[in-house]
Amino acid sequence: MTTPRSLADDLRARDDAALQALVRRRPDLALPTPGDLGQLAGRSVTSASTARALDHLTRFGLQVLEAAVVCEEPFTLPQVRALFPDTAQADVDAQFDDLVLLALVWGEPDAWRPTIAARETVGRFPAGLGPTLAVVGGGTPADLVAALDEAPAEVREVVEALTWNNPTGRVRNADRVVTPETAKTPIEWLLAREVLRPLDKGTVVLPREVALHLRGGRLHRTVTTEPPAPDLHHHDPVVVDRLATGTADEVVRHVGTLLERWGVAPPAVLRSGGLGVRELRSAATLLDVDEPIAALVIELTKA
């Protein structure tokens, strides 16, 4: 089997059933009908289409996608599983397969990659993690972990505040030179040992490897594979029937008012057979309702 070099190659290797499943889950990709699989791949990586696909993911689906973004490319499925140590492997695998089906992740078992659009849509700090040491520079993960093991309690409090949420903090002169001997504050202690790294003159960041160590290797504090139970409210059937009757009476009155007015002064009709915006607004004013409600009354009157 040829290794796919792009998402387009990945799609070309899929069978008809897989492509049909992709279009069913992401129907915007088929409107208008793409000329070829290259065009389908191009549409699937647009920001708008990717954001729409993410909107339909479950919370767990988003968490697994964040894991795919966090892993260094190319990555393998076991690397994703490792970020969910307390979650059943079968659940992670099933959700990952769904991301592949949706063309949010592509590749092959030994070399998976999230699409660039998926990475950008997830955001700069996936799962609240900062950039890697390869990006921000600094010591090795082992050196930083060893430094944290010797950190005073007040220093640990600062690091823990950046562990699960926003990995950045605002600090004046964040890029100043500090040594272990000259450090006077918890922030300076961390800067001197490169546990925190400057992003710019006023911002420090906790490197990804440090945060993952403090999280115990977990990407998320809590993981729920099942969708949340809907918040259902009980309504008295008598009250529901009373409201429905009142609404029906109101609709009948609106239809009568519309027929009475249009029987005397028929509205102008477009060449296509519909009503123009001006006529819709006039009907809404006549009925003293919003335009969507006026449009519904007009449709009911026509029917």
Locations of the language-model features?
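Short, amphipathic alpha-helical interface elements at domain boundaries
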Residues: M1-A303
